């Protein structure tokens, strides 16, 4: 099964999607499953993992309802308040939602880089692990030092780094530090990495495929091709590339260097991680 391990749906309104910038008009509209079904079908994608875009229980419920209607959705990564005293009760209420695979918090949007190290947040993550839910770690590269500290406390939890931790591909600044942190994180065998979100960290209008090769080299070398999964980050990727383009960037790289692991990167790893 060919899997896109990272995409979003939303009913757009400016209040709830304030992270969408003034010059990002392509994202200022509704994105529902039928639009992605057409893209997926044209590019041989059999299923997707839809990931939260708003930090609300209501959105998580909405994504679960979409998964009941659209077989393309194989897994849901929702949002829950990890520091809420009623977290356990909320997780218990979802126990029969088999398509709900894990959760994500928009850590990249937290002004305090140590937000993820708060004891209550860490305890919430540990409770997710007890319920056998995965966790998507959405951070900027500058937050990698804190992420390393966090991951040291979660040696068994299935965790995936979203968007290769968002290095500054456009300028190339900070590459050495990003590389060192990613190599250290990859030593945790429970941690995976999504090859996703790269085009929007590059120069939107004039990126070249070669821009991404040093970053993919680091990720594949550090994590190995059995802990890396492809994600399109559709529709956000459309700020810089088409759906087939983001697939081709990774596909050509894998075909050239890891041809025997193509099915892993484009499906098997996501199936194993999310238990699709």
From Swiss-Prot:
The keyword Endoplasmic reticulum is annotated on this UniProt entry: no
EC number, UniProt record: 3.1.1.120
Reactions this protein catalyses: L-fucono-1,5-lactone + H2O = L-fuconate + H(+); L-fucono-1,4-lactone + H2O = L-fuconate + H(+); D-arabinono-1,4-lactone + H2O = D-arabinonate + H(+); L-xylono-1,4-lactone + H2O = L-xylonate + H(+)
Miscellaneous comment as given in the Swiss-Prot or TrEMBL entry: It was not possible to determine the kinetic constants for the hydrolysis of L-fucono-1,5-lactone because of chemical instability, and thus, a stable mimic (4-deoxy-L-fucono-1,5-lactone) was utilized.
Protein name: L-fucono-1,5-lactonase
Superkingdom assignment: Bacteria
GO MF assignments: hydrolase activity
InterPro entries on file: Amidohydro-rel, Metal_Hydrolase, Metallo-dep_Lactonases
Species: Pseudoalteromonas atlantica (strain T6c / ATCC BAA-1087)
UniProt keyword annotation of Phosphoprotein present: no
Family: Belongs to the metallo-dependent hydrolases superfamily.
Name of the top EC class for this enzyme: hydrolase
Record keywords: Carbohydrate metabolism, Hydrolase
Pfam families xrefs: Amidohydro_2 (PF04909)
UniProt cross-references to SUPFAM superfamilies, sorted A to Z: Metallo-dependent hydrolases
Role: Catalyzes the hydrolysis of L-fucono-1,5-lactone to L-fuconate. Can also hydrolyze L-fucono-1,4-lactone, L-galactono-1,4-lactone D-arabinono-1,4-lactone and L-xylono-1,4-lactone.
